[in-house]
């Protein structure tokens, strides 16, 4: 009998949506708008009519003042750009006999498609470690070999998307609520490669991505954590609410997500460390000094690669 995968204990609790459905860990927005007395956490109103994908990229209503909604032609170019970035990363980095970390979100789909093509064409022997329920389903859908960190604690290469990338290759991730498992897989990988479209390329974090930095928290601590973050660093902290269910988004780990909308550029390494020290915080969506290379699919059909100076 096959041993249960790393997320099997979560399925009975319905902590993640079924593929293709919104809600749970994959949704944002929704609910009514009010402030909790005596706290700095705000429960947002229905700012988005769309739903969040598995991670990384999101679909939002153009009525949301915090969202970036390009014209349809730009959106189609963005999807093509994701495909170009994903395929470039797979061609340049995936080799036979590797253990791969598979990220979450819409961009990673294109990378997995190309991995599956190469497995079939070149008879590659690859093992894939998922970062979320969505990633697990994607691995199975394309007939790739699924494993976990129990059996493969050392990962050769992790590929994932990002919500935003700054000039130093620091990332904001977690738009789809999978930030903790994404960071675990990236952290145990010998190489961490990021794929994104041209909209995610920024000089400073917050230039393009206006939904804030996700923070995964233990449910009982979301109010004191929200107060601590806003008092120490300013900005607004919101509890992420689900769309197709009543109440907050619940991660694959059974936790809540706070979105910290910061109001200035910070020293992100120091901020990341300080927030993680707050009791009740599981992890943040700040990926500092983790990405080795980032592939950006561009509007003109090219791929722009940026890497750390020492690589």
UniProtKB/Swiss-Prot annotation:
A GO CC term attached to the entry: mitochondrion
Top EC category: isomerase
Sequence ranges of Polar residues compositional bias: 57-67
Keywords associated with the record: Disease variant, Isomerase, Methylation, Neuropathy, Phosphoprotein
Residue stretches spanning the membrane: none
GO MF terms, alphabetically ordered: identical protein binding; monosaccharide binding; ribose-5-phosphate isomerase activity
Gene3D superfamilies tied to this protein: 3.30.70.260, 3.40.50.1360
Top-level taxon of origin: Eukaryota
Pathway in which the depicted protein is active: Carbohydrate degradation; pentose phosphate pathway; D-ribose 5-phosphate from D-ribulose 5-phosphate (non-oxidative stage): step 1/1
Phosphoserine PTM sites in chain numbering: 106
InterPro entries in the record: NagB/RpiA_transferase-like, Ribose5P_isomerase_typA_subgr, Ribose5P_isomerase_type_A
Ranges of Gly residues composition bias in the record: 22-32
Region (Disordered): 22-67
One Pfam assignment: Rib_5-P_isom_A
Enzyme Commission code: 5.3.1.6
Biological process annotations from GO: D-ribose metabolic process; pentose-phosphate shunt; pentose-phosphate shunt, non-oxidative branch
Annotated positions of the Omega-N-methylarginine modification: 52
Record disease entry: Ribose 5-phosphate isomerase deficiency: An autosomal recessive inborn error of polyols metabolism characterized by highly elevated level of ribitol and arabitol in brain and body fluids. Clinical features include leukoencephalopathy, psychomotor retardation from early life, neurologic regression, and a mild sensorimotor neuropathy.
Family membership: Belongs to the ribose 5-phosphate isomerase family.
Biological function: Catalyzes the reversible conversion of ribose-5-phosphate to ribulose 5-phosphate and participates in the first step of the non-oxidative branch of the pentose phosphate pathway.
HAMAP family linked: Rib_5P_isom_A (MF_00170)
Protein name per its UniProtKB record: Ribose-5-phosphate isomerase
Source species: Homo sapiens (Human)
């Amino acid at each position: 009998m096959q041993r249960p995968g790393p997320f099997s204990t979560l399925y009975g609790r319905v902590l993640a949506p079924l593929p293709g459905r919104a809600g749970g860990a994959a949704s944002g927005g929704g609910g009514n708008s009010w402030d909790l007395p005596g706290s700095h956490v705000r429960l947002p109103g229905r700012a988005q009519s769309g739903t969040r994908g598995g991670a990384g990229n999101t679909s939002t209503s153009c009525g949301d003042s915090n969202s970036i909604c390009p014209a349809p032609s730009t959106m189609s170019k963005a999807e093509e750009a994701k495909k170009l970035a994903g395929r470039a990363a797979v061609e340049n980095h995936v080799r036979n006999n590797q253990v791969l970390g598979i990220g979450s979100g819409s961009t990673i789909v294109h990378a997995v498609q190309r991995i599956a093509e190469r497995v079939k064409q070149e008879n590659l022997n690859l093992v894939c470690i998922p970062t979320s329920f969505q990633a697990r389903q994607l691995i199975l859908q394309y007939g790739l070999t699924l494993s976990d960190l129990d059996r493969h604690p050392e990962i050769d290469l992790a590929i994932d998307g990002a919500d935003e990338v700054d000039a130093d290759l620091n990332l904001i991730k977690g738009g789809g609520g999978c930030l903790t498992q994404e960071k675990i897989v990236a952290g145990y990988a010998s190489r961490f490669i990021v794929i994104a479209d041209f909209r995610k390329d920024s000089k400073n974090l917050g230039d393009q991505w206006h939904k804030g930095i996700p923070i995964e928290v233990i449910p009982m601590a979301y109010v004191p954590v929200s107060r601590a973050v806003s008092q120490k660093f300013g900005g607004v902290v919101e509890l992420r609410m689900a769309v197709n269910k009543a109440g907050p988004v619940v991660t694959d780990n059974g936790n809540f997500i706070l979105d910290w909308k910061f109001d200035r550029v910070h020293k992100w390494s120091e901020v990341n460390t300080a927030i993680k020290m707050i009791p009740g915080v599981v992890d943040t969506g700040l990926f500092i000094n983790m990405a080795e290379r980032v592939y950006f699919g561009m509007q003109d059909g090219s791929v722009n690669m940026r890497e750390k100076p020492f690589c």
